[in-house]
Amino acid sequence: SPGPGRPEQAGISVPALQRFAGTLPILGVCLGHQALATAFGGRVDRARAPMHGKVSTITHDGRGVFAGLPASIDVGRYHSLVIPPDAVPSGFIVAATVQGGDDEGTVMGIRHQQWPVFGVQFHPESVLTPDGHRLLRTFLETR
């Protein structure tokens, strides 16, 4: 699989997320998003096709890190693993999904229902994510 591997192989990421979720704001990006699912009992599967350097349009619920963003945004994707919609961990909700295309409905964002803990499958820091800086600013202002 292209990319850095599976969440279980990401050093101390999973135990660190389990330890600090609920005490610190957390934003998991790509592998970090997948690690959140793994840390809290969700599942990560291989995507239908690798998405490396691809742009997709997503829709979101306008809450958490998506607050203040247009209802649909373009995002840069660099991954070959995904959290299936039926495998989002307990305590989290799907906050964003792909709109249109062959992988419509693919989970692109999750949010914990009580804690300031967020995951995004895409890369907000990528030039392919024009509104990514706004998402990151919103996260940095999270308390």
Where are the predicted features?
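Glycine-rich nucleotide phosphate-binding loop and flanking beta-alpha elements
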Residues: 5-6, 84, 128
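Catalytic beta-strand/loop cores that center a nucleophilic Ser/Cys/Thr
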Residues: 64-114
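Cysteine-nucleophile active-site neighborhood
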Residues: 1-68, 72, 136
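Generic recognition of short, well-ordered alpha-helical segments
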Residues: 11-15, 87-89, 130-134
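Conserved hydrophobic/aromatic beta-strand scaffold that supports enzyme active sites
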Residues: 55-57, 107-109, 119
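Acyltransferase
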Residues: 127-143
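Phosphate-binding/catalytic loops
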Residues: 114, 119-130
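Histidine-centered divalent metal-coordination motifs
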Residues: 30, 79, 123
